From Swiss-Prot:
Coenzyme Q0 (ubiquinone-0) is the preferred electron acceptor and, to a lesser extent, coenzyme Q2 (ubiquinone-2) can also be used, but oxygen and NAD(P)(+) cannot. Is involved in a caffeine degradation pathway that allows Pseudomonas sp. strain CBB1 to grow on caffeine as the sole carbon and nitrogen source. The gene is cdhA. It comes from the Bacteria. The keyword Oxidoreductase applies. Heterotrimer composed of an alpha (CdhA), a beta (CdhB) and a gamma (CdhC) subunit. PANTHER family: ALDEHYDE OXIDASE 1-RELATED, XANTHINE DEHYDROGENASE. It comes from Pseudomonas sp. (strain CBB1). This is Caffeine dehydrogenase subunit alpha. Its EC number is 1.17.5.2. Binds 1 Mo-molybdopterin cytosine dinucleotide (Mo-MCD) cofactor per subunit. Belongs to the xanthine dehydrogenase family. Optimum pH is 7.0.
Length: 791
């Protein structure tokens, strides 16, 4: 815990407090600078021409009219891409996976509607857009594969020449003897779950600026990315530029949710274009481009077979997962499919399990990271199966869950391909039911049903993969680099402190939380700590950047270690000056004092001046300067967990769903900033509700997007989001210094299953139809009511 590291003096003053986010004032006042606000001298604007077809051969491209338009500086097409340019790399590779080479601009074949085929540099965006209309492209349309079923058809079209099928990779995991478990069980049943295609949809779209120096040797990039170091590495590899000559800066991000955790084709394209025109070039993605070119997510079909005994104990599970990667394996598209496959036992002690997952390609934009990665899909399938099991056995779904949890005494516990480090699932379960008022809700439900009202109660329990990730584990599973984090901390001559981290702040408040950690270690106010992010020239290398609930679990301990080392150096100087026993010294009031004699005090400013300027005043064994570096690389993943409980009312005439109660009880370990944590949970639950009820990227059989704007791609607003209740059970992580477990994806994972379980529970008196496809829209609810008479 924090107090142990700091020997109890000022430590714990700030960690655990709701310190207001320091960035909010600038954002609310319109002073915050995003990438669209950056203007460089002589900067040109870029616009991309994108394929209108989902699958076609490029016969010819004529750019002559576009080049003749006043204000146009250049038009670049696939044929202009130099031969030395390499395909975009992957962050994770999987055994026997097939390559899907991706060029900055399509050269011969386009594989999704929205794939870039040309890019224009012009004096402004208006001229660039006008020039796009003057580019003449002749296409030869090819057969389209627009769904998982079509992709897996034996005699269907292949997206890549020479492939025997459309499968990029296949992964599998197995424990126990599934066949024997199925043969000896009292009950065996199976279901198919269809999870829709989603879009992270951050408020700020992507943006990118490339600027070469006057010699054309050094590259400056401003990129709205969550992964500045990986962006530099990828750019170096793709364009054959030494990484030392590339500087990546990520300004303030208006959200990411995983969408900005990828390296996109537009990025090297803009760099090449800027070199051709010998001027800075900026590209700001418009909303239509965001829907058709920024990564999609979630789409899977999961077939589950489960066996159990009559008392509700689950003895085996088999899962067959098919994930739609879109047109290519993009940065880490396979990752969510793999994670779904290894999470198919959930939080339950299921001794026999088999999971097989296929990642397939279709003529849709690439898919990839979105808050929760593959966990919401796995949780939805498993938690829906538990509810259906309870219904078949006429048991309470809460009771069925409780007898199946991995007990605390079995921790650490290894499931399909992961090890839970710890967990008090039964304790949290009991606490959640009591706090939610489960028994009272059951009584209220019975009374409402007697009046013909359709009230339903739903629940789900999840464990979240966090502290991503152990470097050796990542390398073992095919990651191109480790998941450690490095932090550098410096105190200047005034006593102010600067923390440098490779993490990025995309609205989640990480700079606040890191400042609180550093402030506690040094006896400062968080306002005295400036956290510097988003610049490869200033910030240390970090293994994975911001995402996967790793900022506080990996970045936090790195800052803690750096601050503790700086603290030790400060104390060694102060001890020399104050001639005091080290155990009597306290860091407080921007200095060091003797605990029982506060008049004996030396300021940080005095220590800073000595460390940097008056070196003669330092102890002989102390080097000049006040800087320290901290590195943290966990040996194992951390596992926060929680239980979602929801009460809804369904209007059986309209299919409308109203929330009556919405609660999450969770254990994320030590809470650094409760206000920020609650904000993370609010947003995560909202996105979970969106997946359950609203959002869907719908494609027709020709691979054309029918929901390419916020008018059609529905997202819940403040009017649709219910009031939420949270309860925090704190059990410190045994692996992470400080005890943190992570929270960034927690609200998202279990919400869809809880909401759909509640809706189905409400409809049980009038229909036997099952709601196994999301989103559960009003028309699907009405169809379920009309299709299934209650037995």
């Amino acid at each position: 815990m924090f107090a142990d590291i700091n020997k109890g003096d000022a430590f714990g003053t700030w960690v655990g407090k709701s310190v207001p986010r320091r960035e909010d004032a600038d954002i609310l006042a319109g002073r915050a600078e995003y990438i669209a606000d950056i203007k460089l001298p002589g900067m040109l604007e870029a616009a991309f021409l994108r394929s209108p077809f989902a699958h076609a051969r490029i016969v010819s491209i004529d750019v002559s009219q576009a080049l003749a338009l006043p204000g146009v500086y250049d038009v670049m097409v696939g044929a202009d891409i130099p031969d030395y340019v390499k395909p975009l790399p992957l962050m994770i590779t999987y055994q026997n996976h097939r390559e899907t080479p991706t060029s900055p601009l399509a050269r011969d074949i386009v594989r999704y509607a929205g794939e870039p085929v040309a890019v224009v540099a012009a004096i402004n965006r208006y001229v660039a857009e006008d020039a796009l209309e003057l580019i003449v492209v002749k296409y030869e349309e090819l057969p389209v594969v627009a769904s998982i079923d079509a992709s897996l058809a034996v005699d269907g079209p292949r997206l890549y020449e020479g492939w025997p099928d459309n499968v990029v990779a296949k992964v599998s995991s197995e424990i126990g003897d599934v066949d024997a478990a199925m043969a000896s069980a009292d009950l065996v049943f199976e279901e198919r779950f269809e999870i829709q295609r989603c879009h992270p949809a951050p408020l700020e779209t992507r943006g990118f600026i490339a600027q070469w120096d006057f010699k054309g040797e050094n590259l400056n990039v401003w990129n709205g990315t969550q992964i500045i170091n990986q962006c530099r590495d990828f750019m170096s590899e793709v364009l054959d530029i030494p990484a030392s000559k590339i500087r990546i800066r990520s300004p303030r991000l208006g959200g990411g949710f995983g969408a900005k955790f990828h390296f996109y084709v537009e990025e090297p394209a803009i760099v090449l274009l800027a070199k051709r025109v010998k001027a800075p070039v900026r590209w700001i993605e418009d909303r239509l481009e965001a829907f058709s070119a920024t990564v999609h997510a979630r789409e899977q079909v999961i077939d589950v077979k489960l066996c159990a005994m009559n008392d509700g104990r689950i003895t085996g599970i088999v899962a067959d997962i098919k994930g739609d990667l879109g047109a290519s394996h993009h940065t880490m598209s396979m990752g969510p499919v793999w994670l779904t496959s290894v999470m198919m036992t959930g939080v339950y002690l299921i001794p026999n399990a088999r999971s097989v997952a296929k990642a397939i390609v279709t003529n849709k934009p690439p898919s990839g990271s979105y808050r929760g990665w593959g966990q919401p899909q796995a949780n939805f399938a498993v938690e829906r199966m538990v509810d259906l099991l309870a219904h078949k056995l006429q048991l309470d779904p809460a009771a069925v869950r409780r007898i199946n949890y991995v007990p605390e005494a079995r921790m650490p516990y290894t499931g399909l391909a992961h090890t839970f480090d710890s967990g008090r699932y039964e304790v949290l379960h009991d606490r959640a039911l009591k706090t939610f008022g489960y028994e009272a809700w059951l009584e209220r439900q019975a009374a409402a049903q007697a009046q013909g009202r359709r009230i339903g109660i739903g629940m789900s329990f999840y464990a979240e993969v966090s502290a991503h990730g152990p470097s050796r584990f990542l390398n073992y599973v095919g990651g191109r680099q480790g998941g450690y984090d490095i932090a550098r901390i410096r105190m200047d001559t005034t006593g102010d402190v600067y923390v440098y981290t490779g993490l990025c702040d995309m609205g989640q408040g990480v700079t606040n939380s890191l400042a609180q950690i550093a402030a506690d270690a040094l006896g400062l106010n968080p306002d005295d700590v400036t956290v510097m992010t988003g610049d490869t020239a200033l910030n240390p290398y970090t293994g994975w950047g911001t995402g996967a609930s790793r900022s506080i679990t990996i970045g936090g301990p790195a800052v803690m270690r750096a601050a503790t080392r700086l603290r030790e150096k400060i104390l060694s100087i102060a001890r020399h000056w104050l001639q005091a026993d080290p155990d009597t010294l306290v860091l407080a009031n921007r200095g060091v004092m003797v605990r029982d004699d506060p008049g004996r005090y030396v300021s940080f400013a005095s220590i800073g001046r000595a460390a940097y300027c008056q070196i003669i005043e330092l102890p002989e064994d102390v080097e000049p300067g006040l800087e320290a570096v901290g590195v943290f690389d966990t040996v194992q993943l951390a596992w926060p967990y929680g239980m979602n409980l929801v009460a809804v009312e369904v209007d059986e005439d309209t299919g409308a769903v109203s929330f009556l109660d919405c609660m999450l009880v969770h254990d994320m370990g030590t809470i650094v900033n409760p206000m920020i944590v609650d904000g993370q949970l609010h947003g995560g639950i909202a996105q979970g509700i969106a997946q359950a009820l609203y959002e869907e990227l719908r494609y027709d059989e020709n691979g054309q997007l029918g929901t390419g704007s916020f008018a059609d791609f529905l997202m819940p607003t403040a009017s649709e989001i219910p009031n939420m209740r949270f309860d925090h059970m704190v059990t410190e992580s045994p692996l992470i210094p400080g005890g943190m477990k992570g929270v960034g994806e927690g609200g998202t994972i279990g919400t869809p299953a809880a909401v759909v379980n509640a809706i189905e529970n409400a409809l049980r008196p009038i229909t036997n139809s099952k709601l196994n496809r999301t989103p559960v829209t009003p028309d699907r609810i009405l169809t379920a009511i009309s299709a299934g008479a209650c037995a």
